[in-house]
Amino acid sequence: MTTKDAVLAFLEKDRGRFVSGPELAEKLSLSRTAVWKAIRALEAEGHEITAVKNKGYRLETGSDRLSAAGISACLPEKHRTCAIHFFETTDSTNTQAKRLALEGAPHGTIVAASEQTAGRGRSGKAFFSPDTGLYVTVILKPPAGMPDPQKITIAAAVAVCRAVEAQTALKPQIKWVNDVYLDGKKVCGILTEAVTDLESGGINSIVVGIGVNCAIPAERIPKELVGIVGSLNAEGLSRSRLAADIAAFVLDAFDDLDAPALIDDYRRRSFLFGKEIGFKRNGEALNGTVTGISDAGNLLVRLGSGETLSLSSGEVTIGKL
């Protein structure tokens, strides 16, 4: 870790509180001059740091510059050793994570970015990824066999909701299976993919990618997405902490994807219960009413005929097709 990153990580742990120059120098085994230079470098990068004589330095609660050091400082102690690869801009964090996985990146590796130039959603759809967002992918290494990717997606959706609620008064909800909504608009999408080793033909890893819309100015939302895409605009929201909280929960949940509490939490946050939806099955347009979510994470839909279908995948729209 560089001197600059070490200073940032220390300030991140005490965000909103003054830390004296001598304390920083002593705890990090640095000279006062080295601390001062690191502070100047961080300010030049856009971090909001207040310096007051006889008080020290304070990383402001409104400072929201995403960084590897900031994410690392916000991770729980047991996940502090996770490797973090940060990009200001990248094509896709999932693409980078797949490459790293095939190169031998360990379980728990985190890939994060402030902007994606080729973000992807399900079925290869483009994912709007402006530079104010949070795009984070976690590499998971199954100990044996292939876990149900839908349950990983479920864990990620719950992780996003919990992480947002930990920092704000916002109450996000989940639209089956992989979208998080706020006030009727999509603020997060999730893409879970398997990484296949071409030589062995086996599953090398699973990457779970999460894209969160943060502080997007209304004028930057493309016309075709107006009224559909929303944004987290809470004061004091830290993307570094959001990334750390999401990654930590996904890693914890991965150890027990069948835990009843996980699917119960997912059900509680779903806003589709009782709503009429439209979907396609084998090319046929169908409509029905959502009656629940199974323990496996399937969407239960009652058709007009009285038959109940269990949907394990696919897109659903609110209202009739």
Please describe what each predicted stretch is.
Residues 1-30, 40, 44-45, 145-148, ...:
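Long, positively charged amphipathic alpha-helical accessory segments at protein N-termini or as interdomain linkers
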Residues 2-165, 188:
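N-terminal lobe of the biotin/lipoate ligase/transferase fold
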Residues 88, 174-176:
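Short loop/edge segments at beta-strand edges and connector loops
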